[in-house]
Amino acid sequence: MKLNVLRTDLAEAVNNVSRAVSSKSTIPALEGILLKAYGAKLSISGYDLEIGITTNIDATIQEQGEIVISARLFSEIVRKLPEEVVCIETDERMITYITSGQADYQIVGMSSVEYPDLPTFEETDSLEIKGEFLRDMIRSTVYAVSDNNSKPIYTGSLFDLSDKTLKIVAIDGYRMAIRKEEVDNESNTQFIVPGKTQQEILKLIDDEENVVISVGQRHILFKIEEYSVISRLLEGTFLDYKSTIPKDKKTEAVVNTRSLISAVDRMSLLNGDKIQSPVRCVFSGDEIRFSCTSTIGKANDKISAPVMGEDVEIGFNNRYFLDALKNVDTDEVKISLNGSLSPMIITPVKGDSFVALVVPMRLSNV
């Protein structure tokens, strides 16, 4: 293999692809990236048996070929090369020669035969969505994905496509986030995408470009400009999320989002990694009163907000409360409550583009 490529193109591609590379694997080749030189393109792939990222960049190919090279080392070398033009060449001993300006490296590579094939699958459904919409949907829900592997199904989000509407639902047992957008698609299907995959998708999405999603029985493919991201799907039965949203609402308040975040954030100063006391919220009259008592002290605050319905005193985990509020994209939110032991519902003042639920914490005197 012998080729010339631009360092800026190579560095960006290697940086993005390397995120799918195993940091430690029983298969040594998976700690590397796969380079394939054919036609006028250099293909670059990373894969950890769960998620694979592949891209193609322009290159001047003198000799076609393939090689696997350490992702960590190759990334560092490319990032620090002195000139814009990079020459990459391999020999029959799997030695890779990297040259740029006066700098040159000789790196031991591996045969591409040792690199596992990325999955292929038969497409059962497909969807095209604007990158901006998908980015906002993932960003406003992925925070609620579980990191507890005892229930693997909830380490991903449910993508629920029906009635020309796509909903993304994430739940971890303490909070739930739902975001929906209308799409030009008649399919009715559901699939569960790992949270890790969604995080990688976020880093690649361009707001102006459409993302093409191809779904199979066990895998999903996201086509994002020059990048292809293939991931396994999570298998199992996801919670009937619609039934978990309380129907009754005894108390409602419309609140300025930024003011609410600031108040809860101030209460959070009394909590930390080893201290977790509930933020006590009293909805009454024309205000919401906040307090927090922990082993290091006490704090009190209040904000103005018209409260409709019954007065209620309720406690929440400060981090869960803040996560929900910080992923809202409206200036005001509606808070709905059904007593002190039922989940809090956060929605837009108008419409239903998002729903966030936060399960309360028991208060000692409630």
Residue ranges and their predicted role:
Residues 1-366:
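Structural preference for solvent-exposed beta-strand-turn elements
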